[in-house]
Amino acid sequence: MGRKRVVVLGAGGSIGKNSLEIIRRFPDRFELAGFSVHSNSGFAKTLLAEFTDAQFVSTKKKNSNLKHEIDEEAVRRLIEKSKADIVINGIAGSAGLKASVEVIKSGLDLALANKETIVEAGELIFQDAEKSGSTIIPVDSEHAAIFQLINAHKKGNIEKIIITASGGPFLNTPREKLSTIKLEDALKHPTWKMGGKISIDSASLANKALEVIEAVKLFSFPPEKIEVTVHPQSIIHSMVQCKNGEIFAQASPPDMKNPILNALSFPKMPESFLKPLDFSQIIKLEFMPPRTDDFPMLALGFEAAGKGGAYPIAFNVANEEAVDAFIKGKIGFTDLADITQEVLNSDWTMKPSSYEEVYDYENRARAIALARILDRVNGLQ
């Protein structure tokens, strides 16, 4: 088999740039068939000068500056023209769902880094993937680890999934200081280099909440059989506990290039270029329970996962809008969970049966979240 032709959606983001590094490092295995950026035309020109045969589109929707909107037709055009074998979806936020839908409809394999796709519309995505023949390979380090562990130990033998969390930059911050956290502090992740939104999600534990919901849907495990443990070193990416009580872990240095390379190489096991862990040296591994009282987003995520219906959609959109408001200085750090809770207080029991219904629920949740944010801006809360 020749080189895999790869399309990178969201090439200017953290996942996109790491994916491009993999393609550069292994020109005998992969070639860049196409890529998208949202609006960074300068970055696109630089890439086109380097990858002269690659197709390119901007996913920015005309006459719209909203981050949650993308040009689906542009994604469809890119997929058709690129003649790709696999697509990496590194688009951040709920906008990535529409891109995933286009990839799945095309029948191409999807290396999925956009967790919102599964959180909001996992059941619909899996149905369409079965019809089109697409394989969905998780790129998130935790879900990539679980994916490998389940393949190795068989789902029927597994009693519990254990997802690790770094604890973020405020792992040891006293509760009374959380309300005074500044944006620049929330962006300083201790172990991972990530984009702004996901860095803040990590700081609030919203990212881990989304990962719990994603794991419930991706691996068909109930939330009561999923546990989160704080592991500051980010060396163990996830674990599974088998029915005999034994626990198996996936361990590797905290570098997103590893799960990206694995996803692009699937179903083969690639030879990595990353330096493996050296157990001849002292390696410190710590585990502790998450501070759910101080960081309530994780508990809200478990609640949304357990209730099902459109609750995961409401959780994701509420958090997305709250994070955007925090970045713009409109609300404080502890408002992130309060706003999300207020949105979840509405009735979201109806399960969406189409993508259109998913988008309707998104719009409804977004309107409530924006109203709650405006209340705070106007000093009403």
Curated annotation (Swiss-Prot):
Which Gene3D superfamilies does the annotation name?
A: 1.10.1740.10, NAD(P)-binding Rossmann-like Domain
Instruction: Tell me which InterPro entries the record gives.
Output: DXP_reductoisomerase, DXP_reductoisomerase_C, DXP_reductoisomerase_N, DXPR_C, DXPR_C_sf, NAD(P)-bd_dom_sf
Per its UniProt record, the required cofactor names are: Mg(2+); Mn(2+)
Q: Which UniProt keywords apply?
A: Isoprene biosynthesis, Manganese, Metal-binding, NADP, Oxidoreductase
Question: Which enzyme type, at the first EC level?
Answer: oxidoreductase
The answer, when asked if Nucleus is one of the entry's keywords, is no
Tell me which SUPFAM superfamilies the record gives: 1-deoxy-D-xylulose-5-phosphate reductoisomerase, C-terminal domain, Glyceraldehyde-3-phosphate dehydrogenase-like, C-terminal domain, NAD(P)-binding Rossmann-fold domains
Q: Which reaction does it catalyse?
A: 2-C-methyl-D-erythritol 4-phosphate + NADP(+) = 1-deoxy-D-xylulose 5-phosphate + NADPH + H(+)
Task: List its EC numbers.
Answer: 1.1.1.267
Q: Which residues bind NADPH?
A: 13-15, 40, 114, 116, 195
Quick one: which residues bind 1-deoxy-D-xylulose 5-phosphate? Answer: 115, 141-142, 166, 189, 202, 207-208, 211
Q: A biological process (GO) annotation for this entry?
A: isopentenyl diphosphate biosynthetic process, methylerythritol 4-phosphate pathway involved in terpenoid biosynthetic process
**The family this protein is said to belong to:** Belongs to the DXR family.
Q: Which HAMAP family match?
A: DXP_reductoisom
Q: Tell me, what does this protein do in biology?
A: Catalyzes the NADPH-dependent rearrangement and reduction of 1-deoxy-D-xylulose-5-phosphate (DXP) to 2-C-methyl-D-erythritol 4-phosphate (MEP).
Under what name is this protein listed?
A: 1-deoxy-D-xylulose 5-phosphate reductoisomerase
